[in-house]
Amino acid sequence: MHRKPLLDLLARYRAAHPDEAVCADRIRALVETQRDCFERSCLPGHVTASAWLLSPDGKRFLLTHHRKLDRWLQLGGHADGDADVAAVALREAREESGLAELRFAWAADTPVPVDLDVHRIPAHGSEPAHDHHDVRFVLVAAPGQTIFESDESTALEWFDMDALEDVADDDSVLRLGRKVRRLLAASALQLF
């Protein structure tokens, strides 16, 4: 079953973060009940993946100013049929940043999500409002690369870690950034 790895990942995340059980259970319910949960056509929501992207030294983070949503967000997007959410996060980060050399910030063999979130996406054009069931990872960029803005954004920018509250106005982005800051302070992330 192609969704079993994600269900296992959600179970491990839920066990490690019992305070986030409600969100983990919402995503699990979608994956268990919707055959097409990895397709953007799945309504009322579908699986997405995203990445908090750090500079090689961990002192800065990269956000995109999303064209449709008009706000600063982490890089990420639709699974488009791919059940491997870690691969989706990596693919989307590469596409949206122009950075080819990225790696997961964990020493473990298997990428571990740092956060889960279910958030509402407003209707846009012919697309109805729907939920993104987002699995979030931390990536680190190799040194010496130049960022390139994609057509999905109006801006792409590196920010100092202490500027998080000045830049982000979305609660889920703030929560994600604060989690990463705590992990950096605890030296729990592997940088370049």
Identify what each model region corresponds to.
Residues M1-R26, S97:
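Predominantly extracellular/luminal regions of secreted and cell-surface proteins
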Residues R14-S50:
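Acidic, metal-coordinating catalytic segment for phosphate/diphosphate chemistry
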Residues E20-A24, F137, Q190-F192:
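Short glycine-rich, low-complexity/disordered patches
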Residues T33, C42, R67, Q74, ...:
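Residue-level signal for pocket-adjacent positions within structured domains
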Residues E39-Q74:
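N-terminal strand-loop-strand
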Residues R60-R94:
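Aromatic- and glycine-enriched beta-alpha-beta binding-site module
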Residues D80-R175:
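Unchanged
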Residues D171-F192:
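Charged phosphate-binding loop/patch that engages nucleotide di/tri-phosphates or the phosphate backbone
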